[in-house]
Amino acid sequence: MTERIGPGAFVAVVGASGVGKDALMAYARERSEAVAHFPRRVITRPSGPGEDHEPVTEEQFTAARERGELAVWWPAHGLRYGIPASADVAVGAGRVVVANVSRAVLDELAGRYQRLVVVRVTVSDEVRAQRLRARGREPEPGIGQRLARPDPAPGHQADTVIQNDGTLADGGDQLLRVILDAAGAPLATG
């Protein structure tokens, strides 16, 4: 068995599409860049509003994976997603890495990193449906399918659950607290 990567921590932000993971991460990123690394996901989808990722073709993704440039990757919704290997370097250097990942890769991450912190973001179905419609990435039947999709890792425990029906600051501050706790840094007040 390969030795797990540390001494830093990997904060895995998980939750269904439309719960606000990217917004919470952007909020926390602005307030924790000194202690945390937020790698851009590599996705086989063109860039668009509301998601900061590295758009690549299927061929580019496969080549990056074969060259070992991805720490972890997974297929979802007809696309492929990956976290750059810079995550391994940062965790190995003692930093906190924060990434939006699929719940389906949590066991793989637990085997890869010495310290895995799982943050599950949830929101009411009504708010989630509104957010998915506002995003405009898919037609109404696709939104219904997303709302009905079961959890791919129902048995995996979350270390923190953020109910993201409130303000961005409410949820963002909860995520920030998790990141700073993982880094052993104090939460600034005021």
Swiss-Prot record:
Broad EC category: transferase
UniProtKB keywords: ATP-binding, Nucleotide-binding, Transferase
Spans annotated as Disordered: 135-159
GO biological process: 5-phosphoribose 1-diphosphate biosynthetic process; organic phosphonate metabolic process
Keyword Transferase: yes
Gene3D superfamilies: P-loop containing nucleotide triphosphate hydrolases
E.C. code: 2.7.4.23
Molecular function terms from GO: ATP binding; ribose 1,5-bisphosphate phosphokinase activity
Alphabetical list of InterPro entries matching this protein: GK/Ca_channel_bsu, P-loop_NTPase, PhnN
Reactions this protein catalyses: alpha-D-ribose 1,5-bisphosphate + ATP = 5-phospho-alpha-D-ribose 1-diphosphate + ADP
Role noted for this protein: Catalyzes the phosphorylation of ribose 1,5-bisphosphate to 5-phospho-D-ribosyl alpha-1-diphosphate (PRPP).
Family membership noted in the UniProt record: Belongs to the ribose 1,5-bisphosphokinase family.
Protein name: Ribose 1,5-bisphosphate phosphokinase PhnN
Phylogenetic classification of the source organism: Bacteria, Bacillati, Actinomycetota, Actinomycetes, Frankiales
